[in-house]
Amino acid sequence: MTEAQTRTEPSESSESSEAVAPAITSAADSAPEAPPATTAPAIENPLPEDRYLNRELSWLDFNARVLALAADPSLPLLERAKFLAIFASNLDEFYMVRVAGLKRRDEMGLSVRSADGLSPREQLRRISERTQQIASRHAHVFLDSVRPALADEGIVIVTWAQLDDAERAKLSTYFHEQVFPVLTPLAVDPAHPFPFVSGLSLNLAITVKHPDDGGQHFARIKVPDNVDRFVELPARGDSPGVVRFLPMEELIAAFLTVLFPGLEIVEHHAFRITRNADFEVEEDRDEDLLQALERELARRRFGSPVRLEVSDDMTESMLELLLRELDVAPGDVVEVPGLLDLSSLWQIYSVDRPGLKDPPFVPATPSAFGERETPKSIFSALRDGDVLVHHPYDSFSTTVQRFIEQAAADPNVLAIKQTLYRTSGDSPIVNALIDAAEAGKQVVALVEIKARFDEQANIKWARALEQAGVHVVYGLIGLKTHCKTCLVVRREGSTIRRYCHIGTGNYNPKTARLYEDIGLLTAAPDIGADLTDLFNSLTGYSRKESYRNLLVAPYGVRRGIIERIDREIAATRDGAEGRIRLKANALVDEQVIDALYRASQAGVQVEVVVRGICALRPGEPGFSDNITVRSILGRFLEHSRIIHFRAIDEYWIGSADMMHRNLDRRVEVMAQVKDPRLTTQLNDIFDSAADPRTRCWELGSDGHWTALPQEGHSVRDHQISLMERRRHP
């Protein structure tokens, strides 16, 4: 499993930057909108100033929920180790982006306060306090629970002191042949300045003593990141089936005298630094965007430090030296008992012990597309009606991937246009687009090369597509293209028909097995016309005046959603049963939150299911007492965005979260789902999430998340229930 598969998309950089917006409009800007309802009357009760929760602390609460899964003894053991790794990777990215952005604003003297009234410095202080708590909890869940449980199951992480002489002799051979040649001990003295320490690298800080004059010097060794973190030991004859691992830093520490011959090793400690990765490309209309991005990627390596993790046995003098030389503030130090960088537990997760993992699940193929062994033409199926796919319960490879591959191979297909935000290393989607271009089809790929931490991969794919003859567009100046859309143009007799896919998740077959997402496959003429207009806006200079069934950011998603909330309010006041159900990764945008508060005041029942950040404060009498907020975490990463307005009877799916970055600085697409067969599927998802027995966390008005159901009550798992439905429809 790759890092990209575990990414939980915690954040982007500063939310305050302005975007240069290209000519894209949406349904909210146009006449053919659904008929507006009467304006909702003014609310008598004003909204209080303290109505928002802090987004940064809310994100840390999200990661604490991930940690709660790692601590849950009812989960398979290696899945618990996986959640420890995910927690660590998440926290790394949070510091690289969110904390880095706050530090920059604080250092520049920018006094802009967060929506809940905190200055950057106040937020940094609270983040530090909260991080110390959950980082300590993270380490102890591993040390006191998961590591001993792994040992009981025959997966043992040992120390050097636990090895016998024969094992040490074998490891000595391994060290000298495989590890020693790639190590570079770096001493610090007047002739050797303090070495550059790359971000997220694991290092040993060492004090050596010269026997002649007793002089002590600091040295640093980087633990190589191109070898396994854990060295697997040969099996013992007296312990069949037991797998044992030694951390690489322990192996290196055991042979420091080989690296520093003739010197006394006084002390050694592990440390790890996190650097600022919150860089924005300075986009100039007169400069090649690809060149600008590559220049920025080179700078990212040298970002300023934002966190220093050290082993908790590090001496005060060693810590002071690191703080001084790395220019790290004492408040940015995290002392860790035990191993640093538990993201490397992915290696332990890969041990072949299926009994310690979730049982395998084979995704289904929607009946409209035939059986896996006897597939039906996607095009003929879509002519019969729209199809809603729900990954990973519905197979990505036999639905969306097959749609694109069939389009590439079909001689009647004239053109394929697609957005690509993140895709897999060996992408069948990209290969299909290349095949289509080489077969003479018109192929357009909008590759978002600014997708954070996937920039290099996307640059590689963009160049491969260009070499095959694909028309590649490298995103838009000032915006990220985050929408998930594909348009296929096909000749059928004397007519042209357009087939479309609009989704909530990336065109990535690997993450599609791990991320929960929704996709709409349709041959509806109005959606085909909408996507044609959208791609013309993305690739050219046209300005679309109206969309029929889409809301498109950066102009129309927020406006369209708030308009529909207002219509729901008006319908409720006219006697309808008002209800808004919203599923998203994050709910931060103040304008959307305030609209939901107004809905609650008007008697509309609001049910929010959010995976991560939530700045809305539910359950407060007078303004949010009709709002509930739940969070569901589990085997799959909840990633779909769905909205249902009951009184006005509208369902929408799409790529946009309710965040400033999505609504103001990205191209996002939300599509209306109209077919009652498909809206029933969406209702089933909401009903399952809202079931009182569903394992989840519920947000209180004080910002505290409570695990539900309470002990002693019947429990069901939302994701397992959806898997069972696919097995037994």
Swiss-Prot record:
The active site is at H482 (phosphohistidine intermediate). An intermediate of this reaction is the autophosphorylated ppk in which a phosphate is covalently linked to a histidine residue through a N-P bond. Keywords: ATP-binding, Kinase, Magnesium, Metal-binding, Nucleotide-binding, Phosphoprotein, Transferase. Residues 1-46 are annotated as: Disordered. Its cofactor is Mg(2+). One of its GO terms (biological process) is polyphosphate biosynthetic process. Residues 25-42 have a biased composition (Low complexity). One of its GO terms (molecular function) is ATP binding. It comes from the Bacteria. It is an enzyme of class 2 (transferase). ATP binds at N90, Y515, R611, H639. Its EC number is 2.7.4.1. It holds the Pfam family PP_kinase_C. Signal peptide: none annotated. GO terms for cellular component: polyphosphate kinase complex. Disulfide bonds: none annotated. Mg(2+) binds at R422, R452. InterPro entries: PP_kinase, PP_kinase_C_1, PP_kinase_middle, PP_kinase_middle_dom_sf, PPK_C_dom2, PPK_N_dom, PPK_N_dom_sf. It catalyses: [phosphate](n) + ATP = [phosphate](n+1) + ADP. Catalyzes the reversible transfer of the terminal phosphate of ATP to form a long-chain polyphosphate (polyP). PANTHER family: POLYPHOSPHATE KINASE (PTHR30218:SF0). HAMAP family: Polyphosphate_kinase. Belongs to the polyphosphate kinase 1 (PPK1) family. NCBIfam families: poly_P_kin, PRK05443.1-1, PRK05443.1-2, PRK05443.2-2, PRK05443.2-3. This is Polyphosphate kinase. It comes from Mycolicibacterium gilvum (strain PYR-GCK) (Mycobacterium gilvum (strain PYR-GCK)).
